[in-house]
UniProtKB/Swiss-Prot annotation:
Top-rank lineage group of the source organism: Eukaryota
Stated name of the protein: Late embryogenesis abundant protein Dc3
Record field: compositional bias (Basic and acidic residues): 28-56, 67-84, 91-113
Region (6 X 11 AA approximate repeats): 32-115
Keyword Membrane: no
Keywords associated with the record: Repeat
Taxonomic path: Eukaryota, Viridiplantae, Streptophyta, Embryophyta, Tracheophyta
Biased composition (Low complexity): 152-163
Sequence repeat intervals: 32-42, 43-53, 65-75, 76-86, 87-97, 103-115
Region (Disordered): 1-117, 139-163
Covalent S-S links between cysteines: none
Family note: Belongs to the LEA type 4 family.
Gene Ontology cellular component terms for the protein in this record: nucleus
Length: 163
């Protein structure tokens, strides 16, 4: 029986070696799988960290650019407001100057017209008196004193203009 046990022992020996070898290979595979898992996890964490950092940088960049755009817009709006205010002031001043000029022109026109009207009134008055005297003389209604005083006065336009 000893030989049967030897045979059985010898038959079990390769089986044990195979099991041991399989166990070692399984352990090696487990170790490699765990190492690959750890490395993948580490890479994923690193990628996540880089993504978060990139997002923060991008957010900061976008925020900075948005702030710059906002500042530029405010500056442009302020400049437009100031320019409009200046244009309005210039328009007010020009309108005031034009109003003053129109007033001066109206006063000068009134004075000139008043002078012409006064001159024309004097001419009409003189002609009316001359016509009255002529009619009186024609009908013999003028007295002796009036006939001597009456002289025909002729007023011409050129003399009226020079007055």
């Amino acid at each position: 029986m000893a030989s049967h046990q030897d045979q059985s022992y010898k038959a079990g020996e390769p089986k044990g070696h195979a099991q041991e070898k399989t166990g070692q290979m399984a352990d090696t595979m487990k170790d490699k799988a765990q190492a690959a898992k750890d490395k993948a996890s580490e890479m994923a964490g690193s990628a996540r960290d880089r993504t978060v950092e990139s997002k923060d940088q991008t957010g900061s960049y976008v925020s900075d650019k948005a702030g710059a755009v906002k500042d530029k817009t405010c500056e442009t709006a302020q400049a437009a407001k100031e320019k409009t205010g200046g244009a309005m002031q210039a328009t007010k001043e020009k309108a005031s100057e034009m109003g003053e000029s129109a007033k001066e022109t109206a006063v000068a026109g009134k004075e000139k017209t008043g002078g012409l009207m006064s001159s024309a009134a004097e001419q009409v008055k003189g002609m009316a008196q001359g016509a009255t005297e002529a009619v009186k003389n024609t009908f013999g209604m003028a007295g002796a004193d009036e006939e001597e005083k009456t002289t025909t006065t002729r007023v011409t336009r050129s003399s009226a203009r020079t007055e």
